[in-house]
Amino acid sequence: MSDPNQNGQQGGQQNAGGNYYQQYFQKLTQQAQAGGGYQPYGGYGGYGGYGGYQPYGGYQQFYQDGQQAQQGAYNGYPYQAQGAPGGFNNYNNQFQPQQQSQGMTLDDFHKQKQTSQSAPPKQKKSLKLVSSSGIKLANATKKPKEDEKKEEEPKKEEKKAEPKEQESKKEEPKREGTPRPAAAKDEKKEDLPKLEKLKIKEEQAAANASGADSLIKEQEEEVDEGVVNDMFGGKDHMSIIFMGHVDAGKSTMGGNILYMTGSVDKRTVEKYEREAKDAGKQGWYLSWVMDTNREERDDGKTIEVGRAYFETEKRRYTILDAPGHKMYVSEMIGGASQADVGILVISARKGEYETGFEKGGQTREHALLAKTQGVNKLIVTINKMDDPTVNWSKERYDQCVKNLSNFLKAIGYNVKEEVVFMPVSGYSGAGLGTRVDPKECPWYDGPALLEYMDNMSHVDRKMNAPFMLPIAAKMRDMGTIVEGKIESGHIRKGHSTLLMPNKIPVEIQNIYNETENEVDMAICGEQVKLKIKGVEEEDIAPGFVLTSPKNPVKNVTRFVAQVAIVELKSILSSGFSCVMHVHTAIEEVRITKLLHKLERGTNRKSKKPPAFAKKGMKIIAVLETERPVCVETYQDYPQLGRFTLRDQGTTIAIGKIVKIIE
């Protein structure tokens, strides 16, 4: 048998496109037939187009500058890509066989199989043993199944194992003399991966499909009252929104409730009191608990929907403090869409009540918007009863109640069952946490505000319906976070959901409750923040909906709706455009067709479509949005099926979706 060093030198000097490589393996095949075996090939350097050569232990190595020969063993070759990418490891003057797998690519291996097809099966088996053994047989003989997978790994994995490869080279010739059945066994191992991979892929696909079904089934498992009681200590959650005209005392009332329930400590309130006094706004310090924005404190008016959380012995509450100025009605609508109960704050102070309730004041519009957004329980607090202009006057209180009752009845409230009135003082706290003093107000013996809210009937929740959460806000904090109220269903950490209307699959990584604490599950009615995976923050907008993958929310641009026109200076006809508020979404909408006019009192549909509509009329019409919007019919999901139409800063109509056009 010829000297492997000479063969290695000649083989290393061949280019990638040369024929010597094929000739050399044919020669090895002949030698193996004649001599019963062959020594391992010592590495084919430069293969792959570089044309270099790989040095052997007995070959003097010259650096590129051609100056000094290196006779002894050396460590670390300073130049890369000279036949062996990444440099060389320890080589000694004494010949050490090198594994073929170091310098051969997967394409070369297939070429090798083609050139050796004419050889007898035994030689083919031996050849495969050389190409696939090396480190694997020397170091992992007890785990042949793992070796099958390692053959297909990238070269980087092989490079990491080079030191062990060098240590096992001296033992390699002995392994070449192993019995033929072992080689045949290894040949089968070489042929198995393709079939095994195909089988594995099929099994994985089946597992993924069954896993998806089981995941959806798990996500739709019912949540009973026992689970909820264990999680929340038997306390259900209620979202309340403070509404009313600007300066009615909404933020002051909310801040005082937080202080009385212990959600804000005394030291913080005293700090706000000192700061307000220094700023010449001593009477506003309680409102600063809710109005944390500097602009809000300076102007004394709320701009954004403030959020706060408090807890009583019976319930957990989220406060939504809506802006009272007409410039921020859009924010108020977004807050009302997330509320269960509305607290309409009315100032009894002389002049302020008239300003808020008269045409153009926000008292009327806020009450209307609350009804439109599904706030069917309304608590009307006649505030500032301790003001010197009022002084707990029963006559003033009765006047306010009478006017408001007539108006609330006109916009759809059942005053006897859905509305309650009570006199309070948001600043002093009278009538909030405790009942008013009989000495000051002998004519009222009803409950205080918190007492009444704690004893209200539970809100009907769809805990086991498909999950839906309209997104009210988004942010980036070590990932993408969205905020909103769960309108139906429940959600657990790790659940898979769908972001509509973009149809992006996302995973729930973390769930945070009203107090910013991480929890494992949240149910319908909860105000939550969700950290989601699979979408970037810039690809989300308020009005998007996180929904169940199996029962996603409808994503449409056209629908049929029943519309009631409440305020319109001109007439409404086909082609009329305005702005639609539906849950947390705000979209431009156009009325494309008037279908029917509804008779007053009976709601009977007209046979002929009306040519136009005006204030006070109810119609059935087709509406079309500029972009896809996530909605449902009012019958299926009331919170996603009711909307408000606004034009030029005025609420002109309210409506509910009766049919989806897909």
UniProtKB/Swiss-Prot annotation:
G2 as annotated region, ranges: 300-304
Family of the protein in this entry: Belongs to the TRAFAC class translation factor GTPase superfamily. Classic translation factor GTPase family. ERF3 subfamily.
Low complexity bias (residue ranges): 73-102, 128-137
PROSITE patterns documented for this protein: G_TR_1, G_TR_2
Pfam families for this protein: GTP-eEF1A_C (PF22594), GTP_EFTU (PF00009), GTP_EFTU_D2 (PF03144)
Bias (Basic and acidic residues) ranges: 143-193
Species of origin: Zygosaccharomyces rouxii
Region listing for Several sort of repeats, in residue ranges: 9-102
Keyword Nucleotide-binding: yes
Binding site for GTP: 244-251, 321-325, 383-386
Start and end residues of each stretch annotated as G1: 244-251
Keyword Signal: no
Annotated region described as G4, given as residue ranges: 383-386
Molecular function via GO: GTP binding; GTPase activity; translation release factor activity
Residue ranges constituting the tr-type G domain according to the UniProt record: 235-461
Compartments, as annotated in UniProt: Cytoplasm
The protein's name in its UniProt record: Eukaryotic peptide chain release factor GTP-binding subunit
This protein's UniProt keywords: Cytoplasm, GTP-binding, Nucleotide-binding, Phosphoprotein, Protein biosynthesis, Repeat
InterPro entries xrefs: EFTu-like_2, G_TR_CS, GTP-eEF1A_C, P-loop_NTPase, Sup35, T_Tr_GTP-bd_dom, TRAFAC_GTPase_members, Transl_B-barrel_sf
Chain spans, region G5: 425-427
Region (Charged), start-end ranges: 103-230
